[in-house]
Amino acid sequence: MIKAYFGAETFTLNKDFAYILVIGTTDVSLIPGLTIAGATPELTHFTPAADAEYVILGKCKSINTIPVSPTGIPTPALLTRASLSFTKSLKIVVNAGSRITPKIPYIDLQGEPGKDIRKQALSIEKVNIIIENGIKLGEELSNEYELIMIGESIPAGTTTAMATLLALGYDAMDKVSSASPDNPKELKRKVVEEALRNLPTDPLQRLAKVSDPVLLGVAGISLGFRGKILLAGGTQMTAAAAIVNEFDKSKLKDIIIGTTKWIVEDKSADMLSLAKQVGVKVLASMLDLSISIHEGIRTYEKGYVKEGVGAGGSTIMAFIRGVSNSTLVRKIDELYSELVGSNNLNT
């Protein structure tokens, strides 16, 4: 139920781990048509906080339903919570810079929400603070764990990831995925091309111009952690790995990306090309949701949502621990049914 790329099968994941969910927002998500990671562009700023609340509590406090797409498809946090129920992992929420903060305990990296990358995403001071505090958190986690899994939640994060990869010199134009089956590549390209005009020469200044708080937070934690790291995400995690590579080229040997089959098989993108360029190994979960009893879950098989909140990495961790596809889908269906029954989901 897991496919390995670039020698990823040699990476050992069958040990105790901590799940770290890094959340943040970027004003890029307010651009109409760019992301479906929220029912409306304005609601995308609530998605990261609500995702975090659902993973930890099984319900949301910041909004009255779990995050859904404009057509009602549920957040991948559902897959993450179901998968992690089969593990004994510690779950930690880290706020790198979210406009809406979750109503649960979390660790704050003292960052700031990302602004529009066409102007200036972050101040250089906040870039340094997010990375430095992320490194410190990674170092502290090293005292208790040999393995961590890092997930992300930031609507429009694939657009900032593409801008970040291009700013760091990678061939990334039109290679990032989308939560929609109809990847808005033309709009993404237009936004990113505008963001990349008059880029400064200094790499940190470039990150401040076009990146987002989550990419920086994930990179910082990864740089500080002394053990093995599973970056649980899609094309965004290739950008996080690229930032790590800017600071410490020796670190990538300890990092692997764990994602979903919907990302690696996405014909509108090329995640594997990005991973190969950066030099990071990839595992893909072959989770099959076509047997789900819920149409909203089966829709994932049509290319909707694809990844987020560490869904791919979490399902990989469940599979490695002997959980079957049918058992995992039953758990996902059970959680979805609970949401429908509690009116914590608009259907």
From Swiss-Prot:
Q: What's the family?
A: Belongs to the UPF0284 family.
The UniProt entry, under PANTHER family, shows: PTHR38811, UPF0284 PROTEIN SLL1500
Q: Which Gene3D superfamilies is this protein grouped with?
A: 3.40.50.10210
Protein name listed in UniProt: UPF0284 protein SSO2213
Gene Ontology molecular functions: nicotinate-nucleotide-dimethylbenzimidazole phosphoribosyltransferase activity
